[in-house]
Structure formats: structure tokens, C-alpha cells
Amino acid sequence: MMYQTGVSSMKMDYRQICKNEEISLLIEKGNEILHELGYTEHSRKHAMKVAETAGKILKELGYGKRKIELAKIAGYMHDIGNSINRHDHAQSGAILAYQILKELDFSYRDILVVTTAIGHHDEGTGTAVDEVSA
């Protein structure tokens, strides 16, 4: 079986991910659900703030463009699992992200960087396992 190496440049970048209808709908549905549950705002605005902050931190620490881009994508997509349920949203979000990024033709290596960060982002159940998830 051949695997994509993830060495070549990504076909889609953070800005294109932000324009993706499926991802946007998942974020907004999650925001609606959380609003009904009494949580603070978790809209695309929140997602973009997390993404930009993640990118800024990795840039300040001297990471390369690819790693920064993946951190921004993970930050933007980190709460898509709320569209299913707040409970275990990090894990369901990682599964959703895997399928979406696979359909968008991301390399398996890049998919795993993003899904690992999403799956480990919940403050109650997650832990930093690499520079992107941190």
C-alpha cells in the first residue's frame, strides 16, 4: 500500500478551509447547540481566533510554514465535534476532520497532525502530545 508522504505542499490552505461550506456548517451547528446549552460563543469567529493564535505561537517559536498552517487548520476545526455532542466533542471532531481532510486530498501525515491536535484539545480529557496539539 502506498501512502502520501506529506512532503509536498498542501493543496488547500487555512484560508480555503475557512471557506469550506461543510466545515462552516459544522462550526455553526455546534455554536447553536452550545448556545442552547448555555455555553459562550463558539462560532466561526471563535474558530478563527483559535487558529490565528495557534499560528502566531508556532511562528514565534520558529516553526516552519507547513507546521504553522496545520496548526491554524487544527485550531479552526477544533470544535466541529460540538455539532454532534459537547460530550467527547474532541474525539468526534477528530473523526469528522479525518474524513473531511481525506476528501479534500490532504496527505495522511497532515491529516494525522490535525486530527491528533483536535482529538487532544479538550481541557478535561486531552493533553499536549506534539507541538501542534500543545
State where each predicted segment sits:
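Histidine/acidic-rich helix-loop-helix segments that form or flank divalent-metal centers
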Residues: 107-134
